[in-house]
Amino acid sequence: MTDLCVRMCEMVRKIVISVVALLLSFSALAQSERLYLDTDFDFDFDNTEYSGSNLGASETLFGITLMPALRYEWGDKHSLSAGVNMQKMFGSARFLDDIDLIAYYQFRNENYGALAGLFRREKLIGRYSEAFFSNAWLVDNRVVQGLSLQYTDKNGFAELVVDWNGMYSAERREQFRIFFSGEGRFAKVMYAGATASMHHYANRADFCYNVVDDILINPYLGVAFKAFFDFDIRLGYLQSLQQDRLAGGGWQTPYGTELFFRMSRWGVFISNNFYIGDDLMPLYNSVGKEGIPYGADLYAGDPFYRTENAIYNRTGIGYERNFWKERIKVKAEFVLKTDGERVYTQQIISLGVNIAPKLYDKNNKRNK
């Protein structure tokens, strides 16, 4: 714990020095300057009861994440942020279970946006099925390491992201994801979109010839309307292309169809996600040169998309609402899952709080 505290103090010291240096370097160029203290707090509880299932393990993910960061803005479109991402899982013997750097540049105007560096995943705007990212994976991977290019208007959005989450070394595989999400609305209530991901799961420094390619494509068509309740109904197609260059055998091409339904009012919602098709994670139990299965290190999606019976259904009942100009977000959900043989349960509770007090405003000379 002493080593971790020393590491934390050293990291904080370096961040403060870096921020001060950046403030000094940009001050001469700024038309207007503002300094904020962004603080994001997340409380997460995700309990899965999958006893008897071959698809997932019964476990509880329970903890908090704290991300304080200084944000320096100049002009109306540019900002630079630096801080730390700290995670503590309840019951852990460690002082902190994870600590990492947050540092990124952000550009934004009415329609276009860009982020470069290490930034919160919540800044992404895309719509992604849980076949791409499960709730547990998102809780454990809150930081994007790379680049995001974004476009939004009144009729839709588009986003391209590069997330480099593995550096080539003796301890870790080199790996990165390039993913896209785009959607457009038409005929008042209709929308069409597509999501795609290319995951390059490469080698470590101590072995080679064990690259895995994992591609997933999801075009969809939906309708969203109000009739006392808010309704969202979406039909999508999932096509995967995967190959393990170590095992050989060429490309595997599992696919399936997904129907999503949600109705909500006053924050209370009922949702259902019905998937019928192939096992989208055929390499899940394949063993790489580390001597262990690829598992969740390769696949970020919900493991129930590994269905052995060509069917997976997820029904959720819960409450989800934002308060205080969306600075406080709460969600509680009870989930029923079935693989066509048995019914399993999951409980999700999350609380997110964001505050951003202004520390300095050049136009006002000081923050009153």
Short names for language-model regions:
Residues 13-19:
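Sec-dependent signal peptide recognition
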Residues 25-27:
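N-terminal signal peptide c-region/cleavage motif recognized by signal peptidases
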Residues 30-108, 333, 345-356, 360-368:
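Beta-barrel outer-membrane channel/assembly domains of diderm bacteria
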Residues 50, 113-183, 198-200:
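Surface-exposed coil loops of outer-membrane beta-barrel proteins
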Residues 76, 136-140, 302-304:
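A short acidic, glycine-rich active-site loop
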Residues 102, 153, 157-165, 169-173, ...:
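Exposed, low-structure sequence patches enriched in small/polar residues
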